[in-house]
């Protein structure tokens, strides 16, 4: 007589026990000061953010710049010659970048509805708020953000970092250097520069007369140093460097 058997059953919850995932960590933004910058914890990431580039951005926005920097000011005139532009700190630029990474998953992948809702809430929170936490019902998290879904979400963020590293530094060879995304009421542009990634957020207004959308002159921008993302990317360390991709002496940042 044939009998039921559990001979090949997998051990129970081995992965979850060994990894010890904190699913609520996606709903918390922990920022702490460190030497020369900040440490940010979100999800299963720990980012070490230096205060790199802030002084340079403020110099470029002033009128007292060396002639070699004028080309950079002209190229990004809506940032450096615009009285309505504002410089944000690197940890806020990183927050915007992470919000875009989640939004990229939400828009491009076939996510199950409940999981998509959580990704949407998290991305909107990162993009539109500066609070340290967002309340998501524990029941909702338990049902739709399982340990497997958590891993998928974090892997998607790493894939977005990898996508950023395929960009070339701003160049005159026509090679792609930016990722752009339009959301409700705002446009976000992430551009690769010598020092890392320039993140800009522009509001989209609606003309009262005709209902057409136009980009507002108000823009907020900041710089995320390359090292912040590189330690979490999967770029092969031994791959040959493309100088167009990694450096351009014609731009100041």
Swiss-Prot record:
<comment type="similarity">
    <text>Belongs to the filoviridae membrane-associated protein VP24 family.</text>
</comment>
<dbReference type="GO" id="GO:0055036">
    <property type="term" value="C:virion membrane"/>
</dbReference>
<dbReference type="GO" id="GO:0033645">
    <property type="term" value="C:host cell endomembrane system"/>
</dbReference>
<protein>
    <recommendedName>
        <fullName>Membrane-associated protein VP24</fullName>
    </recommendedName>
</protein>
<keyword id="KW-1032">Host cell membrane</keyword>
<keyword id="KW-0468">Viral matrix protein</keyword>
<keyword id="KW-0472">Membrane</keyword>
<dbReference type="GO" id="GO:0039660">
    <property type="term" value="F:structural constituent of virion"/>
</dbReference>
<dbReference type="GO" id="GO:0016020">
    <property type="term" value="C:membrane"/>
</dbReference>
<dbReference type="GO" id="GO:0016032">
    <property type="term" value="P:viral process"/>
</dbReference>
<dbReference type="InterPro" id="IPR009433">
    <property type="entry name" value="Filo_VP24"/>
</dbReference>
<comment type="function">
    <text>May act as a minor matrix protein that plays a role in assembly of viral nucleocapsid and virion budding. Unlike Ebola VP24, mVP24 has no measurable impact of host dendritic cell function.</text>
</comment>
<keyword id="KW-1043">Host membrane</keyword>
<dbReference type="Pfam" id="PF06389">
    <property type="entry name" value="Filo_VP24"/>
</dbReference>
<comment type="subunit">
    <text>Monomer or homotetramer (Potential). Interacts with the nucleoprotein.</text>
</comment>
<dbReference type="GO" id="GO:0020002">
    <property type="term" value="C:host cell plasma membrane"/>
</dbReference>
<keyword id="KW-0946">Virion</keyword>
């Amino acid at each position: 007589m044939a009998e039921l058997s559990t001979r090949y059953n997998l051990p129970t919850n081995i992965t979850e026990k060994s990894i010890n995932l904190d699913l609520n960590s996606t709903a918390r933004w922990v920022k702490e000061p460190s030497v020369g910058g900040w440490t940010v914890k979100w999800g299963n990431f720990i980012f070490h953010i230096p205060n790199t580039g802030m002084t340079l951005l403020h110099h470029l926005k002033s009128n007292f710049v060396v002639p070699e920097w004028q080309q950079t000011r002209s190229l990004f005139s809506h940032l450096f010659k615009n009285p309505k532009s504002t410089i944000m700190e690197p940890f806020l630029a990183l927050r915007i970048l992470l919000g875009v990474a989640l939004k990229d998953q939400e828009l491009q992948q076939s996510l199950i509805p409940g999981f998509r809702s959580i990704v949407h809430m998290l991305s909107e929170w990162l993009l539109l708020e500066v609070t340290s936490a967002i309340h998501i019902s524990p029941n909702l998290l338990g049902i739709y953000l399982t340990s497997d879904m958590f891993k998928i979400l974090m892997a998607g963020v790493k894939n977005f970092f990898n996508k950023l590293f395929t960009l070339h530094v701003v160049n005159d060879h026509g090679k792609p250097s930016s990722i752009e995304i339009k959301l409700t009421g705002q446009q976000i542009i992430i551009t690769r520069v010598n020092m890392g990634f320039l993140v800009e957020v522009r509001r989209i207004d609606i003309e009262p007369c005709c209902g057409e959308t136009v980009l507002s002159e108000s823009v907020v921008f900041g710089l995320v140093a390359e090292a912040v993302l590189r330690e979490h990317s999967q770029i092969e360390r031994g791959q040959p460097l493309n100088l167009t991709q990694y450096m351009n002496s014609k731009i100041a940042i």
